[in-house]
Amino acid sequence: ADPSAKPVLMDNGFEYIPATIIKSSANTQHNYLIIDKGSEDGVVRNSGVITEKGVIGIVDAVSSHYSYAISFLNTELFISARLGESGAVGPLAWDGMSSDRAILKEIPLQFKFEPGDTVYTSGYSTIFPPDIPIGVAGESKIINGATNEIDVNLFQNHKALKYVTIVANRRAAEIESIEQQEEEQPKK
């Protein structure tokens, strides 16, 4: 992403804001990023941080000119991911050890997949748009006889990052508002 490029608002409601990482950690269980774009640039809390090779993190705090993001290389961060072009969805998280590996959990046993199948963002959150390629499926194991847990080899080298794109969902507040309205409705 060219950090001098202008933000772009897409039809899907996401604004894409080119940015540069100015500080990061990569050697702990709770890694973070400091990014050179803030509220004056259109960044809001819970914006996604991506590259063309995958998910990088989620913005957790914003000042006028900078953002603090929780890195995908953080054991407390889970994202909604989809296996294959039209496959099952489950939580994806860093494995806590290798900067190029993650684990996709809760994939039903009846879902068939092959090592090498691509893992994408699911689009089932207000943070990331759908269909961002994240990595490829590797080995798997069955958990409690009920679901698959799949190793994912990430496309993005998280230790060699400089340029990223912040994705701010301009429709997130509307989506969250309608969810809250439904939750407050008396149940029939």
What is each model feature region?
Residues D2-K188:
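A secondary-structure micro-motif
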